[in-house]
């Protein structure tokens, strides 16, 4: 008996009309607008990115697309937890918010924590650290999965570096 994975190409071929995919996708006049609209609705709006400075919103969006919403969420939650302390001389251990659970769910608690972190730190610094975490993700992925190495340490790190960006 054939396994489901072995039947997949036949199932897909039976459903998809080959002619529908023969033209270059960019030849579809409304495709770019449809894709942009979909990303705005399903990613930008659902993550509530309009509430943040553009540099932060862009980075969150890019990481959600490239790492998945949960992957970006876990790194964001860790970053917020790392900055969850008062700098104003109050007693050691004084937190700004309850530490976040690093479950990858970017909901009201995570977004509120990020707003607090951003109110006390330069947005460029937070974006820089988010990029550091993303870079570490790619290195770890490449170190642990040989077939992915050319992507993980070849091209993907360009997503974490902007040569015109100020480094602190």
Where are these regions (language model features)?
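Cell-wall polysaccharide-cleaving catalytic domain and substrate-binding groove, primarily
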Residues: 1-168
């Amino acid at each position: 008996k054939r396994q489901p994975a072995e039947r997949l190409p036949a199932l897909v071929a039976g459903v998809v009309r080959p002619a529908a995919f023969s033209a270059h996708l960019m030849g579809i006049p409304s495709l770019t607008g449809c894709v942009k609209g979909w990303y705005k609705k399903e990613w930008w709006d659902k993550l509530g990115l309009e509430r943040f400075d553009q540099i932060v919103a862009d980075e969150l969006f890019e990481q959600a697309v490239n790492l998945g919403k949960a992957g970006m969420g876990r790194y964001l939650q860790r970053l917020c937890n790392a900055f969850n302390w008062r700098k104003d001389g109050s007693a050691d251990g004084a937190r700004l918010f309850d530490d976040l659970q690093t479950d990858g769910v970017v909901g009201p608690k995570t977004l509120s924590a990020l707003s607090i972190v951003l109110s006390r730190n330069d947005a460029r610094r937070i974006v820089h650290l988010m990029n550091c975490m993303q870079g570490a993700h790619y290195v770890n992925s490449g170190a642990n999965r040989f077939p992915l190495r050319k992507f993980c340490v070849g091209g993907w790190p360009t997503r974490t570096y902007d040569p015109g960006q100020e480094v602190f």
